[in-house]
Every structure is written in C-alpha cells, then in structure tokens.
C-alpha cells in the first residue's frame, strides 16, 4: 500500500509529472519510428532479415536498436553512432590539449564537446549507413527485397534517411535528459532491449517445451537463474563504500570564536561509479574487429579470417571475444570512473565547507586518500561487472539455451536494463524527497511536511 501511495505522490508534483509524461511521449515516438520501414524496401521480405539477425552480434545490435535493425527501419542505425562518437571524443580528450581544456571549462566547455560529438556522430552515420544498405541483400538471403531495385536513387535517399533517423534519435535522447527523467540515450537503448525481450523468451519457451519432456522445469530453472543475476546486478549498482566525514561547527563565545566537533556524515563512493557506460563503450568497440576482418583487403588473409571467426557473427559466445570484452570493460570502468568521480573537486568542496575525513588532512592529502579508496573499490567492481557481462557465454556452454534469450542472462542487455532503471528511479526518488514525500527507494518513514 505504501508503494501505491508513493506512486500517487509522483503525480502530485507537477514538474515531475510533466517530465515523466514527456519522457514516455518521446520514447513512444522512438518506438514508432523503429517500425517505419525504409522507402523502397519490400516489407514482406523482412522475415529472412529477422531470422538472420536474431542471435550473436547482429542479435545484440538488433536489440540495441529495438528491432529496428531487423526491420530495415528509418532508425536501423539506432543510437550507437552517437555512443561511438562519445567514446572517440572522450578517448581523444586524453591526448588532445584543446579537448582537455574544454573538459575543465565546466558547462561552456561541455557544450562545445557535445557539439563536436554531434558532428562526429554524423560522420560515423555516413560510414555506417552505406555499409548497412550494402549488407541487406546478403542478410535477406539474396532475395530481391528492394521494390525500386538497387538503384543509385534508392541508396542515396536511404543514406539520407538513415543519417537523419540517427540524428533524430540523438535529439530525442538529449531532450529526455534535459526535459525528462533519466539519461535519455541510455533510456532509448533500454526501451529497445525490452522491446525485443518477449520474442526472445517466446522462442526459448517454444524450443524448450517442444524438444524435451522437462521443458517447463528447464524454463523455471532459467527464470530462477535470471532473477538471481538481476539481484546480483542490483547489488553491484547499489553497493557503496561510506567514507566518514566530520564537520567543525563554529560557535561564538564572548569576544572569541571556537570550533567544536559537529555531526558525522558520510561520502558514499559507489562500487560501480561508472554505471553501465563501460559496458556500452566496450560493446560498441567489439563490433569493430569483425568489420575490419571482413574488409576486402583482409577477408582472404589469415588475420582477417581470424578476426571474423573470433569477433564476427555468433562469436560473442566464444573464448577470445569474451576475454577481450571483459578486459575492455575493466579498462573503461577505470577510465570512466576517473572522469565521473572528480576526487580533487570533492576534496576542495569538503575543505571549503569545513569538513574533513578523520585522520586525513584537508586538501591534497584528502584527494589522494579518496583516489586510493576509489582504486581499491573499482578493481573488484570492474571485475564483477565484467563477469556479469560475459555470463551469457558461460550459460550457453552450461545449458542448452537459445542464443537470443541467452543475451538477457547478464551481459550488456541485462546490465543496461538494471542500471538505467535504477538510475531513473533514483532521479524520481530525489524529486519526491525534495518535496518531502516518501521516495520510491526509501525504506524509512519520511512524513510530508506541512
């Protein structure tokens, strides 16, 4: 009953209600666009495209786009070009002084970085759109799916539409972030993944029931394992290391002032401070080796064949793919944590507010101490994150599970769903608490103030 009362409180806050409605509206627009087939494509021929993109790397890419990839939709590129552009810009920020300067300029610098990311997104789209169109005949089993034929007009117009679709999806994500609730880009990916989940489960259910007498028991075991992985993912996202902080309280007595010890508070340092971004970044990079191996200049060479065999098609359940994937997640976790947890700023803010960590001097020593703690908790956090990410490959080896359904047993799909859902709930929770209502994620009683 308390949860229902909390949901009612959400609609009592006008600003929060408007933000939620805007978010839902923009997500519906995105889902509608994912169903619109490119002009010139015969929709009746899309069955073979869907069957060739229901598992492996293409299956994951299709999940990221909410099924738009398999529908030859105007949103077939999804939001991944924007993610790729963000990765490139952040990596370049390490080596390029101009970008380093922008990162230190606060809001104005971030605005310029966003503009650079947008232009780079367009450039990536101009490369990916022709590649996607060129791959359609093979993915459709060689059928003549183009109603207008494979003419130059079709290719030119389709490239323009695909690039525009990606830009529009990017705009939707930014609007959700600015005017809605949650991180817009992550929400678009999460909604796309959720949209493909029922079909994957239905295929697994049909396969399990039709092939063995213990099919229902197998499905129940899979569901139990699935919920256990969700629980582990939630624990990873929510786990924090609390650092005690003491504040000096200044009081006046006669002609002099003195400091007395104030109340003790805590700085919550998250075990996984980088959230789901290392997973998204690593997954975006894992699409690259297979594409490189398939280039004309490499596809007949030993290197090209090895890249395609280990990083293309259904290789995402293979050994080399998951070793590289796990290592990339660990590296990106450290990289993104360094960006999102500014220990220098935390130490300066603590010093200015009269706070200090017991036994640690304010200023530089505090910053170094926080850096040390973050390094200690980021290692197990990143390893745990990597283990959950590669778990689909493990469960495929242990149990006879459909590859499309296995993607939801940990891995990128589940971690994105859990991480984004918790992040969105926390943002809604902060709105409720600021207005003195019980939060969605708060267990204690928090009465509304008059």
Each PLM stretch: what is its role?
Residues 1-103, 108-450:
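N-terminal cationic and glycine-rich segments that engage phosphates or anionic surfaces
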